[in-house]
Amino acid sequence: GFPVPDPFIWDASFKTFYDDLDNQHKQLFQAILTQGNVGGATAGDNAYACLVAHFLFEEAAMQVAKYGGYGAHKAAHEEFLGKVKGGSADAAYCKDWLTQHIKTIDFKYKGKL
């Protein structure tokens, strides 16, 4: 897989070239970084809320564009949210998942939304 940035900060290597999505990805990096540094329910709830909001926005953009990879992409989101909600996804897992997901799964929609 791709190396996880340390410190965990979004950089241009994560660009999808959709400003709304790139800005949301930046927010996810910040939320997961905060969760890992602070811990506790509040930081975790904030990260989860950011993930849900972003996934819904991204999935809606895929549906509007009739993007062919929508079903598999949505399933990946749901699997990840299940692990986060179930408590089996620590900060290191979340950082790695987001890094790999953006650079492999999200990059497939470049130029298609």
UniProtKB/Swiss-Prot annotation:
Protein name: Hemerythrin
Keyword field: Iron, Metal-binding, Oxygen transport, Transport
GO molecular function terms attached to this record: iron ion binding; oxygen carrier activity
Highest taxon above the source species: Eukaryota
Binding site for Fe cation 1: H25, H54, E58, D106
Oligomer and partners: Homotrimer.
Function, as annotated: Hemerythrin is a respiratory protein in blood cells of certain marine worms. The oxygen-binding site in each chain contains two iron atoms.
InterPro entries: Haemerythrin, Haemerythrin_Fe_BS, Hemerythrin, Hemerythrin-like_sf, Hemerythrin_metal-bd
Similarity field: Belongs to the hemerythrin family.
Binding residues annotated for Fe cation 2, in chain numbering: E58, H73, H77, H101, D106
